[in-house]
Amino acid sequence: MMKLYKYLSDGTFRDHLPSHLNGEVYFSSWREFNDPMEGFFVYIANRDPRHHIDAIVGEKSAYRVSCFCRSWNKFLLWSYYTNKHRGVCLEFEVSKKNLPANCSLDPVNYDRTLPQFDSSLSADEQAKKFLITKMRPWKQEGEWRLLGRNLQQYSVPFGRLTGIIFGANYADGDPHDATRQQVVHEIRSMGRHPPVLYQAYIEGNAPEVRRRVFNRYDQNRIQVN
């Protein structure tokens, strides 16, 4: 078992709240990611057979991706992916052996150059390799990727949701606080092992985000309609 974290904007979290509370995650097309070189690879046009290249491109199109991180306290990731610390970070407890058969979970490899075509690998093996390889400037993210092949749905069971961390700018009086009210309402009906709720905060000149568990006063003062 391991802990993985997913940074989300408040809107995305709210739109899929029931699924997230059930330990499900959603996939996206890798073409929608913020890296303009996502999925790129190098081949030599006059040496590498075109039909092999086309097969790899076809295999890449069969995959959708969901992105995670091993850390919840990375300041830049909160800034990039949670709308300036106004969103959330979800904490999942995950076991690879419990994933659906058409899914794979791997750490991203970071390299100085783009990956190259390799005739010793199948088209599917190369497609997966290219989708979990990024250039070194992205290494600070420490990303893990869940790849789903030929999915019939856009969400799959991933693991147990063990924590929800609300961003440092998720303050009382902010209109986003309605989501926290909804979360408290939902987890009160979950029974055993509900996720722990945390509030992220930034202290002084500390380089990392910190968090505290909501105390009894915090939880009681949230009015649930």
Where are each of the predicted segments found?
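Partner-binding and oligomerization surfaces adjacent to conserved cores of proteins
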Residues: 1-225
